[in-house]
Amino acid sequence: DNKYKARIKILVKALTPEVFAQKVEAEFAHTIKTLKVDAETLAKMDENFTPFAYQDYQDQDFTELFAQHPKFKHWFNINTHAHKVKGYRIVTISLKRTGVAPGDVTSEEMNLIADLADQYTFGELRTTHEQNIALVDVPQKDLFALWQALDQANLARAHIGFLTDIICCPGGDFCSLANA
């Protein structure tokens, strides 16, 4: 192991898992006692998170579209999730496919996803810890058009949360930490 790479696995191996766990628990116990955030600090932090100007959309009835387009129904059920605002959904775009390192996306695909974020959301996309991309504020009325654009670009793979949505290291060819 390379001790100059900041990796938890190296620390755990040096300390032993038991000692590492004890140190984590001790730090947590100390932090939970000393961490105090007052209302003024919370209000100041809240100023940094201006809410988007959501439209007053209604939830959509996709019954007819689901009957006509079973692939859309499958994608909707797997790759979209409830949103806190009525009439919106969160869409997860899978970056997993055969023959490509998980999470890899070409510049053309990323430009397309950015354009779709501009067209169908507030211009925001997020990378996820699952090595995917999320469009978090998609109006339900635009889901079918978004799915069609993703499908045309081979980005509408419906396997979020399944074994094929694996999270893994892309290996030494792509990551300097692969051999740490």
Positions of PLM-derived features:
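Peripheral terminal and linker regions in Fe-S/redox and tRNA-modifying enzymes
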Residues: D1-A180
